[in-house]
Amino acid sequence: MITETLLTICAAVFLCLSYRYAVGRPSGFPPGPPKIPLFGSYLFMLIINFKYLHKAALTLSRWYKSDIIGLHVGPFPVAVVHSADGVREILNNQVFDGRPQLFVAAMRDPGQDVRGIFFQDGPLWKEQRRFILRYLRDFGFGRRFDQLELVIQEQLNDMLDLIRNGPKYPHEHEMVKSGGYRVLLPLLFNPFSANAHFYIVYNECLSREEMGKLVKLCQMGIQFQRNADDYGKMLSIIPWIRHIWPEWSGYNKLNESNLFVRQFFADFVDKYLDSYEEGVERNFMDVYIAEMRRGPGYGFNRDQLIMGLVDFSFPAFTAIGVQLSLLVQYLMLYPAVLRRVQNEIDEVVGCGRLPNLEDRKNLPFTEATIREGLRIETLVPSDVPHKALEDTELLGYRIPKDTIVVPSLYAFHSDARIWSDPEQFRPERFLDADGKLCLKLDVSLPFGAGKRLCAGETFARNMLFLVTATMCQHFDFVLGPNDRLPDLSQNLNGLIISPPDFWLQLQDRH
């Protein structure tokens, strides 16, 4: 009898403690789903929408009738915000400028130290970001720079030659079929974007013959992007899972990608370290190395330079090509939009030269179409996660220090209170009554905002415009034998949204 009573009491205590653990949350924390040991609320999100966690979070927000929800991803408390005011508050308030120390970020470094810019915070982040941006600007980063525009034009001419005449070198067969006009997206765009970006950093570009290295870099970069998710995947919750299920957990592909990308940039750094001459400034690399050699200054060392280069270059060899490919999907699904873009380019630019940045002001519908593509298919739906640097409040709720804070850019870009018809691909929303581009109408945030604003926004917008205008000027996007129109529901969710690799048939317009 006593034994049965004790067992009953123990079971009751266990159930009570389990219930309190599951529903318990810090005082004043936003409403949200219960948590279970080890996984927190992560499994609930997977059940709601296994493929798109940003959509699962928005579903929870609607269930709880709150623009902010609180949950746990493993041991980490997380606040996800879905309102315009809340998203802007996170992006512009420096108290949310921290970065959580997730395993996916730490694994990029051999010693699992978080270096670089993306996943760094505190004095090191501020110092490195300020220094790199200051001196990269001298070489054309973040501003109009005539020489860089000429380099981009050379890259576009090389891309057009590859498309029309087919591969010349072995690595080009991975991007274009023999005979030309059938191209693999998103891979085609990224090496040329990366090569233009390399001119900023190294003051040189690779020749087409040498670009096999860039093709592999782009493939590995996209592989890394596709094998994580908004919240660091299961690897950031239980890192030891990589020892049991290295393939299923995504660790093998993440690690393969990371090792290749890091070694690629390490080789460049060592090349310039070995050839450095004091007082000779060939490019940004020499500027940074000179700072390293002034003494053991805070953060200026070989490993930090490697990861800084990875972070500043990563969007150029992954995100730009992916965003262009997402836009191609929409142009194929909305042929009337494509025709209007092409007609505008024909009228303003003609076919005797490539479009340039001076044409942008005279191509408002083309620019509006690119901006609508950035809005409707948010590349980074949950932004890069932020972290509260101190106890604070957000939308009336208490946010403890070290809470992961997620501004849902996807929710912002699909909010009917802002866009009225967010599900519609409608570039006209950014034009005024006279058909001119009206920047006041574009409140989208595809590159974030505040101190964490994507440093490559200017370069990315310029590349998106020049590549889009060039492709639409020269080609129609048609369906080849056995091709189907893009199915947007098949797009992949990782650190970014990306289309699965697909072959696109092109047809000359002139």
UniProtKB/Swiss-Prot annotation:
Membrane topology, from the record: Peripheral membrane protein
Protein name in the entry: Probable cytochrome P450 304a1
GO molecular function, one term: heme binding
Record has Endoplasmic reticulum as a keyword: yes
UniProt cross-references to InterPro entries, sorted A to Z: Cyt_P450 (IPR001128), Cyt_P450_CS (IPR017972), Cyt_P450_E_grp-I (IPR002401), Cyt_P450_sf (IPR036396), Cytochrome_P450_fam2 (IPR050182)
Localization, UniProt: Endoplasmic reticulum membrane; Microsome membrane
Matches recorded under PROSITE patterns: CYTOCHROME_P450
Job description of the protein: May be involved in the metabolism of insect hormones and in the breakdown of synthetic insecticides.
Binding site residues for heme: 454
Cofactor: heme
Keywords assigned: Endoplasmic reticulum, Heme, Iron, Membrane, Metal-binding, Microsome, Monooxygenase, Oxidoreductase
